[in-house]
Amino acid sequence: MADQTSQNDNQNGSGLPGGGPSGTGRGRLIIWVIAGTLLALWAYSYWGMGASGGERISYSEFRTQLQQENVERVEVKGNAINGSLKSQATRSEQGNTIEYQNFVTYLPSFGDEQLMDLLESQGVNVVTKPESSFPWGLVIMGLLPVLLLFGVGYIFLRRMQSQGQGLFSVRQSKAELYDKDEEDTTFDDVAGADSAKEELREIIKFLKNPKRFEGLGGKVPKGVLLVGPPGTGKTLLARAVAGEANAPFFSVSGSDFMEMFVGVGASRVRDMFSEAKETSPAIIFIDELDSIGRKRGAGLGGGNDEREQTLNQLLSELDGFEENEGVIVMAATNRPDILDSALTRPGRFDRQITVDLPTKQSRHEILKIHAREKPLSDDVDLEEIARSTPGFSGADLENLLNEAALLAGRHGHDAIQYSDIEQARDKVMMGLKRDGMVLDDEEKKLLAYHEAGHAIVGAVLPNADPVHKVTIVPRGKAMGVTQQLPEKDQYLYRHDYILDRLAVIMGGRAAEELIFDTATSGAENDLKQVRKMARKMVLDWGMGDQFKHISLGEDQGNVFLGDEIAKGREYSDDTAREVDEEIRRISEDAFQRAVDTLNEHHEAFDQLADMLIEQEEVSGKDVLNLVNGDTDEIGHMPTTNGAAASEENGSADDHEPDEATVIEEDGESGEGRASGSADASGS
């Protein structure tokens, strides 16, 4: 390989100057030498041609010397007159006196008809020379800009060649071929996703022994699409396939196809498949497929779309007129909803493998993999961490342990302690503590009652998730947080569970009106969450009293993703009015349930608010003891204690695991870490 590289370098540098970085310098030097020579020739043609030397004098001074009969000899060439005087003459210039005997001057443009008669009358020796007939000055002045332009272009091209970026290499594929010996990722490094790994193992088996399947009349899928939320390990699975497969593995990002030049994307697709066919059987992996695979016809413009041209070429290569045997295409995306239907049909991407958020057992396995090279103290229970992190993706868990390791180093620990992991969870999910934010007594009391309202309602209602921690310590954008941890992963939401959760979210606003007889802006995010959830109950889930067995919801398509410009609702104005009334009724019922619960447990409500004002953080166990009247069991929370929490603001019908509920008091936006469930709330 080294000999081949050396040969290529010699070929690049032999025929032309500037075949490499040093050649580029030589080429630049040659250009400057040529430009300097042309400039000198032009200057000579403009100032020097016809003037052999002498003091430059005016024509009037020349006539004066001629009238004084002091001119001995002149040489005329065109308009230039060179001559010598019989005796030295003087002239003043800028206050200086200059003596001269040889001189140079030029005839005026209108000529001098008496000059020759005057020269002959005084016996001056006159010599004439023919003027050059070729206009060198004009030619050089015209060629100089053109030559300079070519010189700049020459340097630019040589520089591109020295960097391996020839003029036409922009059309070549940017897919990288992974070496099996260099790629050390295997399926053992991928925890969870067992069904996805099994599907991919089947692809690898076909590549290793295709006759086993062909004998049964089976054909390998032409395309495999990995679909799932961000951070669930889709790209990691592809790297594992590269490490396991005994076949060439080409990897490219969807954005690598697009450039500023027209036609580059389609050309790169052709080149990529051409390379893969030469080494077939082979695997091509396209990461972030949605960057080139979006629905055609998207947007409001009617012009040609370079992305669509690239997509059309990809469709043709996957299942076009020519057979594409021996090449399997893998792709990954977290936006399958915007992919073109022609791309996802059978015959192109035959299989869609869903890589979902990990379950509790999968989270435990993922934590064990990421903790391999991290020293853990004896008090760290990875299974407990997995239980308390519902809704976390693999990337979230990796980041959690990394933040814990950084905190352990900051605290001077020899190993990662459980307190480091708890602090890391609070930091990752709620942000840093805002130590510089100081609340006055009135705001602190209002915030304490607001969070106490969430916590008491959450601890009393039977279907609500257990309260884990309540704090009024400002973190990130949140001024206060009530954390709830589900007892298990939850994929479906019951009607009574959603109603209890709505009441918990309304607990903060109910507390404000009960204690202070007013409302604050801190409940802004609470109200948004309630409206969003109540609307889904009525329109999508059939949980309204008036619309129990009908879905009125409709996906609102995005025109820039290929959907229609406008979509009208499919129900009447009267029905829309009833929907609004139903949403209002659900919200009011949730608020009233929260008020009734706080009135019923007003003593525990006041005690919890006082504890928050004094301690700023209260554990969920202490909240439950207050509700049950077991005040003797109440202890003080250490300041290092934390709990896993996440804000859920997706859709409950996504069938994703339940997550920790975070109810935030926030005067700004109340937004926390989005994790993907519908029933989280923030205030």
UniProtKB/Swiss-Prot annotation:
Zn(2+) binds at residues 450, 454, 526. Its EC number is 3.4.24.-. Residues 1-21, 627-683 are annotated as: Disordered. InterPro entries: AAA+_ATPase (IPR003593), AAA_lid_3 (IPR041569), ATPase_AAA_core (IPR003959), ATPase_AAA_CS (IPR003960), FtsH (IPR005936), P-loop_NTPase (IPR027417), Pept_M41_FtsH_extracell (IPR011546), Peptidase_M41 (IPR000642). The active site is at residue 451. It comes from the Bacteria. Residues 1-28, 158-683 are cytoplasmic. Binds 1 zinc ion per subunit. CDD domains: RecA-like_FtsH. ATP binds at residues 228-235. It holds the Pfam family AAA. One of its GO terms (molecular function) is metalloendopeptidase activity. Residues 655-669 have a biased composition (Acidic residues). Homohexamer. In the central section; belongs to the AAA ATPase family. This is ATP-dependent zinc metalloprotease FtsH 2. It comes from Salinibacter ruber (strain M8). The gene is ftsH2.
